[in-house]
């Protein structure tokens, strides 16, 4: 690749400083090795603060004690969050036991956080333990390369345990796509695994020496489940099957949910349909989409660097034609597909191979030993005896997959004893999700994970008050507008602005194919509950059979749908 790009679809101008950082990083090495030996600070400094993200890490600090430490003239309590690369979310029990032990012995919080990108995160790794974390992952056959920053991130794959044969085929493609789009630099192996430096020049034939303009997310989706929320992602492969055989993919490009408060040039966006491809063209199309975005994406303004903005600027047809040219493939007409849901089916399900699958609801994805509810220990106990695999879902839950009939009762007993199965968990709680936010996320503006459980309790009370306690609303809370909890695809989305202040978005749908519109700006959680009380009451009495909350709000004109987010997302006052 020629990194000096020019042409009608290249954004000219002064490059963002992140581009300088990548160019000068020596293929993601920077001075990270020197920083590791600097005992004067618990953090990484200068460019390394951002470069470690390419290696799957974010530098954070405990914001609950930040002010107190500042008063004591101490630097923030720096610690690292590490995110594993786990395409499709599949992990073996043996691998799980390794990460469980590391979390217990080497992190400040002792927890494992399942994420809605089908992987897990360690929070609270001190700098002196970072190398140990990478070496542990390597020992069990895992890594954290390219799970953050301007690369193709962890590739998602629908976790439908019933369609075992089809899932396996789709999962294999998720792994192939992940491997094909990985950085080729040896920096990760040299820095963390003590591999010898090789006297050759690094090359990045797909990503280029300055990598992508912005993060890039990819999914493999098996209808009728949209558990991966395809419209939150840059590149999506929708599985098309004939019987139980995968024959090709519909390709959708340019989804993304992040925005910036107060900047109307940023907005969430749905992915656009490009067409259908047979299986043999999958990697060529994936590479062509990535390289087109690599060359045409905006490198002067990071807020507008995502694929969704490139498509809006150059046009979907222009981008699609360039992908076809680079791949040497013509898209066929989109094949029919339909989504009917996106939540996990909690509990026992039998697969076509006569094996059983147990989906455990993990509130907020946080596995920790709580008083009277030792969740983390329970999963470890199951891992010690389970012969199948674990599957992390895009809803932050955990599937114990491939359980023979003879082991079913034994595993259920362990799960119940440790609080991993709770018959009192409502369908509303199972369909609610939050990002991590405080105290560890540096971008958090409002509470999310710590806020959600009690907030859901209040919503449950409202549902019961109006006689629909067995119903649910897809509810998401995110602590800032970057969109990690995918609130911009929820029926009710709360986006944090300040402590106990949220923008309230309404009007998404249950299957994740409509962006919710802002209904009220910068209001308290109590005000949100008052609004929901009234609207849930109207839904309870005025809904049509099987009509979801978001669909009801749109049909009754309580709020107008977002039809073209680049143009109408911010017309909220006229649309309410």
Curated annotation (Swiss-Prot):
One of its GO terms (biological process) is cysteine biosynthetic process. Siroheme binds at residue 484. Keywords: 4Fe-4S, Amino-acid biosynthesis, Cysteine biosynthesis, Heme, Iron, Iron-sulfur, Metal-binding, NADP, Oxidoreductase. The keyword DNA repair does not apply. Its cofactor is siroheme; [4Fe-4S] cluster. GO terms for molecular function: 4 iron, 4 sulfur cluster binding; heme binding; metal ion binding; NADP binding; sulfite reductase (ferredoxin) activity; sulfite reductase (NADPH) activity. GO terms for cellular component: sulfite reductase complex (NADPH). [4Fe-4S] cluster binds at residues 435, 441, 480, 484. It catalyses: hydrogen sulfide + 3 NADP(+) + 3 H2O = sulfite + 3 NADPH + 4 H(+). PANTHER family: SULFITE REDUCTASE [NADPH] SUBUNIT BETA, SULFITE REDUCTASE [NADPH] SUBUNIT BETA-RELATED. HAMAP family: CysI (MF_01540). This is Sulfite reductase [NADPH] hemoprotein beta-component. It comes from Photorhabdus laumondii subsp. laumondii (strain DSM 15139 / CIP 105565 / TT01) (Photorhabdus luminescens subsp. laumondii).
